[in-house]
Amino acid sequence: MLVVQMPFSFPVAHFILFVFTVSTIFHIQQRLAKIQAMWELPEQIPVLASTSKALGPSQLRGIWTINAIGRLGNQMGEYATLYALAKMNGRPAFIPAQMHSTLAPIFRITLPVLHSTTASRIPWQNYHLNDWMEEKYRHIPGEYVRLTGYPCSWTFYHHLRHEILQEFTLHDHVREEAQKFLRGLQVNGSQPSTFVGVHVRRGDYVHVMPKVWKGVVADRRYLQQALDWFRARYSSPIFVVTSNGMAWCQENIDTSHSDVVFAGDGIEGSPAKDFALLTQCNHTIMTIGTFGIWAAYLAGGDTIYLANYTLPDSPFLKIFKPEAAFLPEWTGIAADLSPLLKH
C-alpha cells in the first residue's frame, strides 16, 4: 500500500518550534545560574575588589582590621601594628575609613580602606593587643579579626622598618613645606648643618600624668639637659621646638645660645605641620607620648627621651613597658619625680 506522508500543518510546526525555543532558554538559564553561584561569596563575606591585585590567591582569605582610636601618634601605631601582624599571620589588612582620613592627608599609606557599610556586614572576632609584642600574636586564630587596643611598640614592626618608613613617607607638599622652613633658619648668622627636633607634650598630660598615672611631664631641667647633650656633641646645632603648650616652652627653654626656634602651630586637630618639621630634622628630643615616639622613629639619628617618669607603683606600668616603647639605641634622661613625692 502506498502511504503518502503529508507535511506538518502550519500550526503544528509553530508549536514544535516554540517548545524547542523554550527548552533552549531554560537550559541556558540553568547554566548561567551555576556559573554565577561559583563566583559569588556568601552575603556576610563581602567581595573587596581592591584586594585582588594587591594580594596573591593564597592570601585572599579573610579580612583583618584594627580600631582607629586616639590621635595621630596612636593611629600610626595601630596602622603599623596591623600591617605587621596581618603579614605575619598571612591575612589581608584593611584600615577603617576614619584611620584613612587621619593618615592619608599626610602619608603615602597603601593599605586599602574598609568602609563602614562593608564592615557592618562582617562577623568580627575582636582580639585585644597589649602594647608590646607577644609570641601568641604570631598565631592569631580567625579569618575576620578586628585588633583592639593602643599598640605603639617597635616590637611589633621593627623587623619591617624599611616598609614602615615607606608607608609613612610624607607627601611631597608636606615635606617641602617643612624643608623650606628649615632652610630659612640660621644660628649666629650662618645656616646650621644639624637640626634637632624638640617635641614637648603638655596639654591634657599636665594633669592626667600626676592625677591618674602617678607620673610627670618633662620639666625645665630635663629640657636643659637634653639640649646640652646635643650641644656637647654637635657643632652649632639648631633646636626646632614644637609643642601643644608653646607659651610654657617660651618661658622655660633657655634661648641664651640663640640656637632655639619655636616653630609649628601646636594645633592637635591638624598636626601635619609640626610632625613634618620633626621628621625632617636630623635628631630628636622627645618628652612623652606617641607623637614624639613616631617623630623620632621616622627622623632617625640620635634620640633623647624622658625616662622613669612614673613612680614604681604607677598603674601606667601595667599597660606600658618602656623597653618596648623606646628603641635600645635611644638615650634616656631620668625625670625628676620629686613633685610627686611631696604629695
UniProtKB/Swiss-Prot annotation:
- Give the membrane topology, semicolon-separated if more than one: Single-pass type II membrane protein
Q: Which residues cross the membrane?
A: 15-28
What Enzyme Commission number(s) apply to this enzyme?
Answer: 2.4.1.69, 2.4.1.344
The molecular function terms of the Gene Ontology recorded here are: alpha-(1,2)-fucosyltransferase activity; galactoside 2-alpha-L-fucosyltransferase activity
Q: Which keywords label this protein?
A: Glycoprotein, Glycosyltransferase, Golgi apparatus, Lipid metabolism, Membrane, Signal-anchor, Transferase, Transmembrane, Transmembrane helix
Organism from which the protein derives? Pongo pygmaeus
Q: Catalysed reaction per UniProt? A: a beta-D-galactosyl-(1->3)-N-acetyl-beta-D-glucosaminyl derivative + GDP-beta-L-fucose = an alpha-L-Fuc-(1->2)-beta-D-Gal-(1->3)-beta-D-GlcNAc derivative + GDP + H(+); a beta-D-galactosyl-(1->4)-N-acetyl-beta-D-glucosaminyl derivative + GDP-beta-L-fucose = an alpha-L-Fuc-(1->2)-beta-D-Gal-(1->4)-beta-D-GlcNAc derivative + GDP + H(+); a neolactoside nLc4Cer + GDP-beta-L-fucose = a neolactoside IV(2)-alpha-Fuc-nLc4Cer + GDP + H(+); a neolactoside nLc4Cer(d18:1(4E)) + GDP-beta-L-fucose = a neolactoside IV(2)-alpha-Fuc-nLc4Cer(d18:1(4E)) + GDP + H(+)
Return the broad EC class. transferase
Designated name of the protein? Galactoside alpha-(1,2)-fucosyltransferase 2
